[in-house]
Amino acid sequence: MLKLHEKSGDDTVALMADIGRRARAAARPLAIAPTAAKNAALLAMADAIVARQQDILDANAIDVSNGEEAGLSASFMDRLKLTPARIRAMADGIREIAELKDPVGDVIAAWERPNGLRIERVRTPLGVVGVIYESRPNVTADAGALCLKAGNPVILRGGSDSLNSSAAIHACLVEGLKAAGLPEDAIQLVPTTDRAAVGEMLKGLGGALDVIIPRGGKSLVGRVQSEARVPVFAHLEGICHLYIDRSADLDMAVKIAVNAKMRRTGVCGAAETLLVDRAVASTHLVPILDALRAAGCEIHADQEVLKVFFDAKPATDADWVTEYLDAIIAVKLVDGIGGAIEHIETFSSHHTEAIIAEDPKAVERFFNEIDSAILLHNASTQFADGGEFGMGAEIGIATGKMHARGPVGVEQLTSFKYRVRGSGQVRP
């Protein structure tokens, strides 16, 4: 089990520098590790998580108790809490990653030049990855497994609220590395709650870190983006929109709206704003809102909606830019697909948006004009998930445009290099 480092200041600086050196030392052997060894490690990790389920639950109980005493929100506690089912899902996710094709060494493209040079673009590991996250202990397993499959050492800095849970999961990951003969330093968990550790990671650990992936709230991601001296895959808040077009099937719209908001309110793919075409307000609006209220959702509505649906609170300007992560949704009437696109492009965090429609022209316009990482048609926003995309798992949903966008899975954790084969050519 991870030994907690309780000192701070210069001790934290030295601790993080050592973690960085060890991760960098693990980079080369991991980059050339055979697929069979990586898969063996992953399967051993999954087995260890199942075998140590009670240890993980006991550690999580400590975190949950501390969170309750601290008065953390219900949505935060939902993200923090582990159950036997969630632990099994964690293990299953690692097994799915083991079954994925190894991207390292994959030839993306190949061509021959007129002078006979044969050129290949080949996938390679990114290098040492730093993941900074908050309350979700399952990120420890997902990030560790994904980075391993892609041949990247990873330094995990979880939230202090979930440190006991993350440490118990990390012990299982190390057990898997040992079983496969891979470097134990390939997956390291920062063993301190000292916030200075994050600052050291943002500085790059003396050149040890190649990329940082933040997974958390707006303040965390904002700090990482403003202070990081290494590239960042930004996972911004999920201000996700669900638009009900005039051509939408009502039964489908009701079912998807309830699922998109209420299946799990604390996930980044939960719908936070419902937009309804004014043309079907008289037929679609109230049935959808009735279903949401029956499911326990609080409605924050614009003035037009309040005229026909009374069991709601008036929406303010802040509602359109709020990631509730709770059983609350903002609702607005818009002038058709054009009004929906205008609202989304104004207020979206460019994470995930969905349209419910039978009109193919409306769908194509939605897909073509909205610049978000994930767009869905006639499906819940809660499918915005690497596992649901067949990636086994994800580290996060990248909302930027550089390198990775959307679910960050194994393939997105690679870069590439060029291999050029000649037969004695010299440049004239």
UniProtKB/Swiss-Prot annotation:
GO terms for molecular function: glutamate-5-semialdehyde dehydrogenase activity; NADP binding. One of its GO terms (cellular component) is cytoplasm. The keyword Transport does not apply. Coiled coil: none annotated. It comes from the Bacteria. It catalyses: L-glutamate 5-semialdehyde + phosphate + NADP(+) = L-glutamyl 5-phosphate + NADPH + H(+). Its main location: cytoplasm. Keywords: Amino-acid biosynthesis, Cytoplasm, NADP, Oxidoreductase, Proline biosynthesis. PROSITE patterns: PROA. The keyword Cytoplasm applies. GO terms for biological process: L-proline biosynthetic process. Pathway: Amino-acid biosynthesis; L-proline biosynthesis; L-glutamate 5-semialdehyde from L-glutamate: step 2/2. Its EC number is 1.2.1.41. It is found in: Cytoplasm. Belongs to the gamma-glutamyl phosphate reductase family. Catalyzes the NADPH-dependent reduction of L-glutamate 5-phosphate into L-glutamate 5-semialdehyde and phosphate. The product spontaneously undergoes cyclization to form 1-pyrroline-5-carboxylate. This is Gamma-glutamyl phosphate reductase. It comes from Mesorhizobium japonicum (strain LMG 29417 / CECT 9101 / MAFF 303099) (Mesorhizobium loti (strain MAFF 303099)). The gene is proA.
